[in-house]
UniProtKB/Swiss-Prot annotation:
Localisation per UniProt entry: Nucleus
Superkingdom, natural source: Eukaryota
One Gene Ontology cellular component annotation held by this UniProt entry: nucleus
Protein name per its UniProtKB record: Homeobox protein knotted-1-like 11
Gene: HOS59
């Protein structure tokens, strides 16, 4: 059967719950137009009263509202909160429902009603998990695909649609579709789910941001070990790039012995290659880096070296002139 709870605009299909739980259902909880063999509309009202008076009714209602909250945009959540706040207190509602059931002579339902309510709550909890998975993966892909289509259209046409419009139909057709697909009673004509064909609305942006943060957290947790391995590999390569202690000592000894002119000749480099076991390129790179380090650390010595070079160049020039 399909019944409609006025305060929350919830359409519940108990036949689906019965099928999910292996066919266990209350005798009056089948059919779509009323209770099968339950006495028509009066029997249906009695069944509603029995459900509302059941101890698990509040839990069932909470599970159903939780399903609605999963994919509802943030800007639409106050509608659900307002409808819940407008309900009478649970105790008063249960008392009124029990009184109505007693006045109508409705059966209590017994174990079959208890079984139905229990399985329905479990079914809704499972449905909520499926919705969360859908929002986390498929809805995110759909929203991003719409956004990419809008960007492509804008790049091709140069036209920028109005924020939140995304209209691809005439106003009459758009209003007709909105009136048929409203999610809540008293909707103002906007899309209840908030997913426009082109532009992202505020609710969509909130949903995208929430899904993005969840995916970011999951990816970070999933790739944490790989990031640690990569970091260790980088540090290992850095450590491997340093020269051994005895090799560096040999080069530094030569440097200190020739600190006034730390430019080894080709014969010096060949001898250092034999002593250290390094390649000629490594020797050249070490002396280049060592000279840079000493230039920055001892500017006075570098300036004196430059002055010596200038004097030697000047002397060479005078010799050439005299010659």
């Amino acid at each position: 059967m399909a019944f409609h709870y006025q305060d929350h605009a919830l359409a519940m299909d108990a036949a689906a719950a019965a099928a999910e739980t292996g066919g266990h259902h209350h005798p009056g909880f089948v059919g779509a137009g009323g209770v099968v063999g339950g006495g028509g509309g009066g029997g249906w009202e009695r069944e509603k009263a029995a459900i509302a008076a059941h101890p698990l009714y509040e839990r069932l209602l909470e599970a159903h509202v939780a399903c609605l909250r999963v994919a509802t945009p943030v800007d639409q959540l106050p509608r659900i909160d307002a409808q819940i706040a407008a309900r009478p207190p649970p105790l008063a509602a249960a008392t009124a429902a029990a009184a109505a059931a007693a006045a109508g002579g409705a059966p209590s339902g017994g174990e079959e009603l208890d079984l139905f309510m229990t399985h329905y709550v479990l079914l809704l909890c499972s449905f909520k998990e499926q919705l969360q998975q859908h929002v986390r993966v498929h809805a995110m892909e759909a929203v991003m695909a719409c956004w990419e289509l809008e960007q492509t259209l804008q790049s091709l046409t140069g036209a920028s649609p109005r924020e939140g419009s995304g209209a691809t139909m005439s106003d009459d057709e758009d209003n007709q579709v909105d009136s048929e697909s409203n999610m809540f009673d008293g909707n103002d004509g906007s899309d209840g789910m908030g997913f426009g064909p082109l532009m992202l609305t505020e609710g969509e942006r909130s949903l995208v941001e929430r899904v993005r943060q969840e995916l970011k957290h999951e990816l970070k947790q999933g790739y944490r070990e790989k990031l640690v391995d990569i970091r260790e590999e980088i540090l290992r390569k850095r450590r491997a790039g340093k020269l051994p202690g005895d090799t560096a000592s040999t080069l530094k000894a030569w440097w200190q012995a020739h600190s006034k002119w730390p430019y080894p000749t080709e014969e010096d480099k060949a001898r250092l290659v034999q002593e250290t076991g390094l390649q000629l390129k490594q020797i050249n790179n070490w002396f280049i880096n060592q000279r840079k380090r000493n230039w920055h650390s001892n500017p006075a010595s570098s300036s004196s070296d430059k002055s010596k070079r200038k004097r030697s160049n000047a002397g060479d020039g005078k010799a050439e002139q005299s010659w």
